[in-house]
Amino acid sequence: MRAFDPDLLPVVVLTLRVTVSALVIAAVVGIPAGVWLGLARFPGKRVLTALVYTGMALPPVVVGLLTYMLLSRSGPLAFLEWLFTPNAMILAQTVMALPLVAGLVMGAVASVPHDLVLQVRSLGATPWQVRWTILREVRVAVLFALLVAFGRIVSEVGAAYMVGGNIQGYTRVLSTAVMMETGKGDFGVALALGGWLMVLALTVNLAAMRLQGRLA
C-alpha cells in the first residue's frame, strides 16, 4: 500500500465507518448514563462510578482480548459470527468509547451547582425535564467528551488488530495499516498513513470547534 494508492480509499472509509458507528453507540448509551449518574443518589453509586473511571483507563489490548474471548468459537457471543469482521471492531471500540463518554459527562453534570437543579425542580419540572435542562447546561462538555472518545478510538491499534485481523479490503483500517507498514520497515508510507489519521482528527476538531461556537 502507498500513501495515495487507490486501495487507500476503502481503508479510510472503513476507518470512518467503524469509528463513527462506535461513537454513535457510545453517545446514545453513554450520554444518558452520564447524566443519570451525575444527578442520581443511590447506594453503590461510588462503586459504579469507580467502574466507569476504571473503564476510561482500560488498555485497548485488554479490550481486544475480552472482545476476542466473547466472540470466539467457545465464547458466549460466538453465534453472532462477528470475529474478524468490522462488527467486532465496532464492538471493541464501543467498549473503549462508552466509559469515556459516560465518565466525562458524569463529571460535567456533577459539577453543575445543586442550586440550579433545585431551581428547575421547584418550577415543577419532571425528572426527564430536569435531566434535559442539565444536559443543555453541559452541552459543551458533552461535545468535548465525544471528541476525546473519537481521538482514542480512531487511532486505536491493539483491539482493532486482535478482533479484526487487519484483513486487506475487509477489516484493514488506517491504524492497523500504519502498524503493518512499520513492521515491514516502510516508514515513509507509515508516516503518510499517519498523516491521513491526523487529517481526519483535524477535520473533526475543526468541525467541533465551529459547533462549539454555536453551542456556547
Predicted regions and their residues:
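Membrane-helix interface segments
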Residues: 40-48, 85, 127-128, 140-141
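Alpha-helical transmembrane segments of multi-pass membrane proteins
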Residues: 13-21, 55, 128, 132-140, ...
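Transmembrane alpha-helices
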Residues: 24, 104-105, 109, 113, ...
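Transmembrane alpha-helix signature in integral membrane proteins
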Residues: 8-37
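Membrane-interfacial helix termini and adjacent extracytoplasmic/periplasmic loops
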Residues: 6, 63-94, 164-167
